[in-house]
Swiss-Prot record:
InterPro entries: Glycosyl_transferase_4, PNAcMuramoyl-5peptid_Trfase, PNAcMuramoyl-5peptid_Trfase_CS. One of its GO terms (molecular function) is phospho-N-acetylmuramoyl-pentapeptide-transferase activity. The keyword Coiled coil does not apply. HAMAP family: MraY. It comes from the Bacteria. Belongs to the glycosyltransferase 4 family. MraY subfamily. Pathway: Cell wall biogenesis; peptidoglycan biosynthesis. The chain crosses the membrane at residues 2-22, 55-75, 86-106, 120-140, 163-183, 196-216, 239-259, 266-286, 291-311, 348-368. This is Phospho-N-acetylmuramoyl-pentapeptide-transferase. It comes from Paenarthrobacter aurescens (strain TC1).
Length: 369
């Protein structure tokens, strides 16, 4: 628990102090956001706002994670140190963040709202996702537990939903596809949510807060733990290190949100939204709560569905629309809601989804007592 407090504290300070310094750098370089003309007219005033703020969030997470482990080692040389699960999560977060950084950099360099083309972006994301999926099936600990398994999970692995039903090779291939589906859904969900000042950051703080709570609980109720109660123990590798990273991410985003809240002094850009989405997907896979992500990240799911419905209905109906504009948050803007009103109400929705996810997580454990 001390590690979580240290990590969160360092992340908060790095983000709070680092973000305004990064804003000054971006302003000096004239690196600002370009706003699409077909968006809400109220957004045109945001043109030129510094972007790529996700760079600070990623840096704060990396610094905090390794500084925390260094401090814990100095306090106790026998401490575990960085875990395989923690490093793999950082790999996916940084990898996706790098793809987003390339996209943002092309936008600001060419002074337009379009960055990487869709094919290049998809290929890069798939490459990072495939490497991650292959690696998480490796690195067994002393108990033979690996960061992930081929079994699809809800709040724990579901034995009768094993992707390795056709053998190890088939299982590995299907797991790579399944993992990339989760990664693509999470990254696109956060990316689509990042359209209003503070919306994605605030919602993500709650999501990572949930993973902090679940990681602590999984550690306390790990199979073989002295605190294990009943038959509901968890077989998750490195749950406490995952809880540490979740706490660090929440704190880093709190520090960033101080500057990103309306009126935003900086946007997270694709650098931030893809990095956060990658981290969300990694938590779902590594904590063995893949299907539960539909509840924990319910706001991201809702906003993604609004885009799918809008595009699908537009094509099938020959040009008609369900919403005034998609993603969903812009529909309410065009209905006359103030941006801050939309953001706060969507934060409330995000909190309700997170509460539902945590309720399902805990209720399953109670049933197994």
């Amino acid at each position: 628990m001390i590690a979580l407090l240290i990590g969160a504290g360092v992340a908060l300070l790095v983000a709070l102090i680092g973000t305004p310094l990064f804003i000054r750098f971006l302003v000096a370089k004239s690196y600002g956001q370009f706003i699409r003309d077909d968006g809400p007219t109220s957004h045109h005033t945001k043109r030129g706002t510094p972007t790529m703020g996700g760079t600070v969030v990623v840096a704060a997470v990396l610094i905090s994670y390794f500084v925390t482990h260094l401090i814990m080692w100095m306090m106790n040389p026998d401490s575990a140190g960085p875990s395989a699960s923690g490093l793999l999560l950082l790999f996916l977060m940084v990898g996706m963040g790098f793809v987003g950084f390339l996209d943002d950099f092309i936008k600001i360099s060419n002074k337009r709202s379009l960055g990487l083309n869709a094919r290049a972006k998809l290929i890069l994301q798939a490459a990072v996702g495939i490497i991650f999926a292959v690696l998480v099936l490796q690195f067994p600990n002393e108990d033979g537990l690996r960061p992930a398994s081929t079994q699809i999970s809800l709040v724990r692995d579901i034995p009768w939903l094993d992707l390795a039903f056709g053998g190890t090779v088939v299982g590995a291939i299907l797991f790579v596809l399944w993992s990339n589906l989760i990664i693509t859904a999470a990254t696109n969900g956060v990316n689509l949510t990042d359209g209003l000042d503070g919306l994605a950051a605030g919602a993500s703080i709650m999501v990572f807060g949930a993973y902090t709570i679940m990681g602590i609980w999984q550690n306390n109720q790990a199979c073989g733990s002295p605190r294990e109660a009943g038959s509901g123990c968890y077989q998750v590798r490195d749950p406490m290190d995952l809880a540490l990273l979740a706490a660090i991410l929440s704190a880093a985003l709190v520090g960033f949100l101080w500057w990103n809240t309306s009126p935003a002094k900086i946007f997270m850009g694709d650098t931030g939204s893809l990095a956060i989405g990658g981290a969300v997907a990694a938590f779902a896979i590594l904590s063995r709560t893949e299907l539960l992500l539909a509840f924990i990240g319910g706001l991201f799911v809702l906003i993604t569905l609004s885009v799918i419905i809008q595009v699908g209905f537009f094509k099938l109906s020959g040009g008609k629309r369900v919403f005034k504009m998609a993603p969903l948050q812009h529909h309410f803007e065009l209905k006359g809601w103030d941006e801050v009103t939309v953001v706060v109400r969507f934060w409330i929705l995000a909190g309700l989804f997170v509460a539902a996810g945590l309720g399902i997580f805990y209720a399953e454990w109670v049933v197994l007592l």
